[in-house]
Amino acid sequence: MWRYLPKRSLDLNRKGLMQRKLDDKYFINTFDEETKLYSKKENTLLLIVDEQPRLMKALENGEEAVLNTIALIKAFEKYDMPIIATEQYPKGLGSTDERILDLIDQKNIFEKTIFDAAIPEVLDFIEKNNIKKVVVAGAEAHICVYQTTRSLLNLGIDVFLAKDALASFKESQKEEALKTLREMGAVRTETETILFDLARDSKDPNFKFISGLVKEMRAR
C-alpha cells in the first residue's frame, strides 16, 4: 500500500512510477513517524470562534453553523482531541451558545475584545499542547475568523476552515473571506469531510459514531 511521506514533492511508488506528494497542510492529522501515516490526532485543535446566540441569530445560516460545530465537537471529543472557544465581548454579546457550553470544558473558553482570536491565551494553549493544525468554526467568517486564520497561518499553523460551520452577515461575505484565506494557504473544507477524514477507515472503532453524526446532519 502506498503511503504519503511528509515534505516531499516527488517520490517513487512500488511500480517505480513518479507520484506527486501533497503538502502536509492537506492532512488533518499530523504525521506519525512510527507508522509513517498521517494518523496522530492529538496535535489537531478545534477552535470555535465567538458562537454566541446574539451574534449567530443575526447571521445568514447562523443556526446551521452552530449545528455543524456541535457535530465537530462531538467528533473531536470522541477522539479525545483538544477543543477551545473564544467569546467576543460577552458583556455585550452574551456567552457561548448553551448547546456548545454543555459539551466543552468551560475553562477552555477565553474572552476577548479584539476581533483576532489568536489572543495570548489561545496561543499559549497551542504552544503547550504542541498544536500543529487547527480546524476553525465560528463567526464572523469575514471578520474574526478571517483575522484569526491569517494570524495562525503566519505562525506556520495549518488551518482547516469548516465552511458550513462558519457564518457571516451575508453569505457573499463568507465566500469572499474563504476565497482570500484559501489564497493565503488555508484549506477550505466542510464538516462531513472533516468527520470522515478523522475516521479514515470503516474499521475505525469510532466509525459507527461518526456515521451517526453524518446521518443526523443529512436528515436536517
Language model feature labels by segment:
Residues 7-8, 21:
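Intrinsically disordered, low-complexity segments enriched in serine/threonine/proline/glycine
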Residues 51, 88, 164:
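Active-site loop/turn elements of alpha/beta-hydrolase fold enzymes
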Residues 44-51:
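N-terminal nucleotide-binding beta1-loop-alpha1 segment
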Residues 19-22, 26-43, 91-220:
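Active-site-adjacent betaalpha module
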Residues 54-59, 64-86, 90-102:
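A positional/architectural concept
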